[in-house]
UniProtKB/Swiss-Prot annotation:
Protein name: Lipoprotein signal peptidase
Pathway: Protein modification; lipoprotein biosynthesis (signal peptide cleavage)
UniProt keyword terms in alphabetical order: Aspartyl protease, Cell inner membrane, Cell membrane, Hydrolase, Membrane, Protease, Transmembrane, Transmembrane helix
GO terms, biological process: proteolysis
Function description: This protein specifically catalyzes the removal of signal peptides from prolipoproteins.
Source species: Burkholderia cenocepacia (strain ATCC BAA-245 / DSM 16553 / LMG 16656 / NCTC 13227 / J2315 / CF5610) (Burkholderia cepacia (strain J2315))
Entry EC number(s): 3.4.23.36
Reactions catalysed: Release of signal peptides from bacterial membrane prolipoproteins. Hydrolyzes -Xaa-Yaa-Zaa-|-(S,diacylglyceryl)Cys-, in which Xaa is hydrophobic (preferably Leu), and Yaa (Ala or Ser) and Zaa (Gly or Ala) have small, neutral side chains
Annotated transmembrane regions: 9-29, 45-65, 71-91, 100-120, 135-155
Pfam families named among the record's database cross-references: Peptidase_A8
Length: 166
């Protein structure tokens, strides 16, 4: 008898999109709070190694291409929209793989959080500033955190899957 693959239920995307929406909600609310509280460039030390700041990132991670002429806003927006389409396809197809899907949902929420910033403000709002003495890690936001956590979980899931197939 031949094995057949059954399609996931039509609602298979719902829980994963729910996670993405929660990420977007927390990301956007945190950015609104920072925008209402801080002037551009202002910083408030919370601990000896952590500040809240308000900076604008017109580029990508770590300010990559932030000094370009403006084309990067639309390029990174298009990249975020493209990633959204690919991730939704993967979630629809592999929604039964929980860790894989949670990983993608976090990445999706983070990507869309930053796409919203680019469309609304023309740049991404960053405000989390970790530092050690005078050395500062580049400021980031909750969307970036979700993308990073999702990427780490994705790598972990893949390593686990590879080890399981041996």
């Amino acid at each position: 008898m031949a094995k057949t693959l059954s399609k996931p239920a039509s609602g298979a995307l719902a829980p994963w999109l729910g996670i993405s929406l929660i990420v977007i909600l927390f990301d956007q609310l945190s950015k609104i709070a920072i925008l209402k509280t801080f002037a551009y460039g202002a910083q408030h030390a919370l601990t000896s190694f952590f500040n809240l700041v308000l900076v604008y990132n017109r580029g990508a991670a770590f300010g990559f291409l932030s000094t370009a002429s403006g084309w990067q806003r639309w390029a990174f927006t298009a990249l975020g929209v493209g990633a959204t389409l690919v991730i939704c396809f993967l979630l629809k197809r592999h929604g039964h793989q929980r860790l894989f899907s949670v990983s993608l949902a976090l990445i999706l929420g983070g990507a869309l959080g930053n796409v919203i910033d680019r469309l609304v403000y023309g740049h991404v709002i960053d405000f989390l500033d970790f530092h050690l003495g005078a050395w500062h890690f580049p400021a980031f936001n909750l969307a970036d955190s979700a993308i990073t956590i999702g990427a780490v979980l994705l790598i972990y899931d893949e390593l686990r899957r590879v080890r399981g197939s041996r």
